[in-house]
From Swiss-Prot:
Gene3D superfamilies, per the entry: SUI1-like domain
Name of the protein in question: Translation machinery-associated protein 22
Family membership noted in the UniProt record: Belongs to the DENR family.
Pfam entry (one): SUI1
Subcellular location(s) of the protein: Cytoplasm
CDD domains, sorted: DENR_C
Gene field: TMA22
Assembly behavior: Interacts with the 40S ribosomal subunit.
Plastid found in the keyword field: no
Residues covered by the SUI1 domain: 94-165
Any single biological process term in GO: formation of translation preinitiation complex
Coiled-coil stretches: none
Cellular component GO terms, alphabetical: cytoplasm; ribonucleoprotein complex; ribosome
Length: 195
């Protein structure tokens, strides 16, 4: 019996399609640039003048122009959308609150991560195993998710979140630490505070 060899498929680093199908996506220009930088041989095979001429020889000139105009319009829309999303991400900030529970016990609350398409449950699980503490995802009063981590690990959490955002190419995002102390109960006039 003969051995069946799996076919090697090369995928685009921008749209994750095979390069032959990048033209059906909305980021063709970026896909072409990426392919030219990473695999010149395949780029020449797909986008050389001869290859383009054979592909378009069956289409009428009007149809070709219409297709290229529609494609250019879609690409511009997609680029504008991606630019808006990037600006929104860079303008937002992550807030790490250190909240005092008892005298020496603290929890930290991490909010503002939902903008960055980060799986909150997975991140909470990572924090729980990385810091050997309890961590959970809860909803705030304004229906946004936050991660609650037991223990005073705000500095370590800040470093980890900054590294995580840097991996996504978001170096300009502000990660702010806030110390929130529990309000002490007011004592009645004339009463002595408990020690």
């Amino acid at each position: 019996m003969t051995e069946v060899v799996a076919r090697e498929v090369y995928y685009c680093g921008v749209c994750s399609f095979p390069p032959e199908y990048c033209e059906f996506g909305v980021s063709l220009k970026r896909c072409k640039d990426w392919l030219q930088d990473n695999n010149q041989e395949l780029f020449d095979k797909i986008y050389s003048d001869d290859a383009l001429a054979t592909q378009t020889s069956t289409l009428s000139i009007e149809r070709q122009e219409k297709i290229s105009q529609e494609l250019a319009k879609k690409q511009l829309k997609e680029e504008a959308k991606q630019e808006r999303e990037l600006q929104k991400k860079l303008a937002s900030k992550v807030l790490i609150k250190r909240i005092e529970r008892n005298r020496r016990k603290h929890i930290i609350s991490i909010s503002g991560l939902e903008v960055f398409n980060i799986d909150m449950k997975k991140l909470a699980k990572t924090f729980a195993s990385k810091f050997a503490t309890g961590a959970s995802v809860t909803k705030t009063a304004d229906k946004k998710e936050e991660i609650l981590v037991q223990g005073d690990v705000s500095d370590e959490a800040k470093e980890y979140i900054e590294k995580l955002l840097e991996e996504q190419g978001l170096n300009g995002v502000e990660v702010e630490q806030v110390d929130e102390k529990k309000k002490k109960k007011a004592t009645a006039p004339g009463a002595t505070p408990a020690a």
